[in-house]
């Protein structure tokens, strides 16, 4: 919005020419989302308490009993700050910006319905896994349909380390990308089981993809690093900046001991957005590295359930997702969180290193 109002005045006021730079607007999108989140956070948390949006705790995780009643649905705060920031600093004529907002909002709506159902039933059981998966797939399909219709966007799949291996999947690219979106969304959701555990790695992955997105939208840098160039993609860096800022602002209140939880409205929307960012910049497979922690958490659940069914009740882990396994081994929650953050940073650096390994 500010871009559309102020940049046209740059002919009379040369200082306003800075609004044409994506980097400038991305930094301010970050700062705006951060400040909005921190400023309205205390009032928002008090409101959640007043309307009794308290978290219900799994009986199996007895060490979390003291967290019962902590306000949830904090993802609404993330969403509000992010959307306001993007609307202020983004070029609202950019179709990719609107598509990532569609994914973020759509997945967030599914998460909101899940959280609302839990609160209404006064349990930790929300929407059924099948209905949640179905709605996620519908939103992903709609977003991908509009994305592949863009003339500048390609359905070619880029493989890390192999610059000449770029098969064109055609319409098969849509179901593949849908799996990336839904898998990423549920991966963040599974990771969100401790104070600050999910939002930290989400911010790290957001930083990684902000770099990939900016490069994908810059013809010269993309050509030099031999990554797919997508005209107009650089504008999505503004969304990445807002995501990072809103995430850091939320961490201010979600860090151990948490004053608020993001809920599914936060984890599903952020995870879906990260998956779509990977698709937008043609780094779908890099999501496995940049979001390595989410992959590990998801794999722990898949292995646990599969092994349990095959062996008639035996388990690989004491409890899944993986962070609960370490928790039940007696490792303090704060130490698990910091160690997982360190792992996410390492995964992020590994993902960025791929830029020079072609």
UniProtKB/Swiss-Prot annotation:
It is a multi-pass membrane protein. GO terms for biological process: cell division; cell wall organization; peptidoglycan biosynthetic process; regulation of cell shape. CDD domains: GT_MraY. One of its GO terms (cellular component) is plasma membrane. It is found in: Cell inner membrane. It is an enzyme of class 2 (transferase). Its cofactor is Mg(2+). It holds the Pfam family MraY_sig1. Keywords: Cell cycle, Cell division, Cell inner membrane, Cell membrane, Cell shape, Cell wall biogenesis/degradation, Magnesium, Membrane, Metal-binding, Peptidoglycan synthesis, Transferase, Transmembrane, Transmembrane helix. Catalyzes the initial step of the lipid cycle reactions in the biosynthesis of the cell wall peptidoglycan: transfers peptidoglycan precursor phospho-MurNAc-pentapeptide from UDP-MurNAc-pentapeptide onto the lipid carrier undecaprenyl phosphate, yielding undecaprenyl-pyrophosphoryl-MurNAc-pentapeptide, known as lipid I. This is Phospho-N-acetylmuramoyl-pentapeptide-transferase. It comes from Oleidesulfovibrio alaskensis (strain ATCC BAA-1058 / DSM 17464 / G20).
């Amino acid at each position: 919005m500010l871009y559309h109002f102020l940049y046209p005045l740059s002919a009379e006021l040369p200082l306003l020419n800075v609004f044409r730079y994506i980097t400038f607007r991305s930094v301010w999108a970050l700062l705006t989302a951060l400040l909005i989140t921190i400023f309205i956070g205390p009032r928002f948390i008090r409101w959640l308490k007043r309307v009794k949006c308290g978290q219900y705790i799994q009986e199996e995780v007895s060490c979390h009993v003291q967290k019962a009643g902590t306000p949830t649905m904090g993802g609404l705060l993330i969403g509000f700050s992010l959307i306001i920031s993007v609307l202020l600093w983004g070029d609202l004529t950019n179709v990719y910006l609107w598509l990532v907002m569609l994914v973020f909002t759509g997945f967030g709506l599914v998460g909101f319905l899940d959280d609302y159902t839990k609160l209404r039933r006064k349990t930790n059981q929300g929407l059924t896994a099948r209905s949640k998966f179905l709605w996620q797939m519908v939103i992903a399909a709609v977003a991908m349909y509009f994305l592949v219709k863009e003339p500048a966007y390609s359905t070619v799949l880029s493989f890390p380390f192999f610059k000449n291996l770029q098969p064109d999947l055609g319409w098969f690219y849509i179901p593949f990308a849908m799996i990336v979106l839904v898998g990423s969304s549920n991966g963040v959701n599974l990771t969100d089981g401790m104070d600050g555990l999910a939002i930290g790695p989400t911010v790290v992955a957001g930083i990684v993809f902000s770099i990939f997105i900016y490069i994908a939208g810059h013809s010269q840098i993309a050509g030099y690093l031999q990554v797919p160039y997508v005209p107009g993609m650089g504008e999505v860096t503004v969304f990445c900046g807002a995501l990072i800022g809103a995430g850091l602002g939320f961490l201010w209140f979600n860090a151990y001991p948490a004053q608020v939880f993001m809920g599914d409205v936060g984890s599903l929307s952020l995870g879906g957005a990260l998956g779509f960012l990977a698709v937008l910049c043609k780094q779908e497979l890099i999501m496995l590295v940049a979001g390595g922690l989410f992959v590990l958490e998801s794999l722990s659940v898949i292995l646990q359930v599969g092994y349990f069914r095959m062996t008639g009740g035996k388990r690989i882990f004491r409890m899944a997702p993986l962070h609960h396994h370490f928790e039940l081994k007696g490792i303090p929650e704060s130490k698990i969180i910091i160690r997982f953050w360190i792992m996410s940073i390492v995964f992020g650096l590994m993902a960025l290193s791929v830029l020079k390994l072609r």
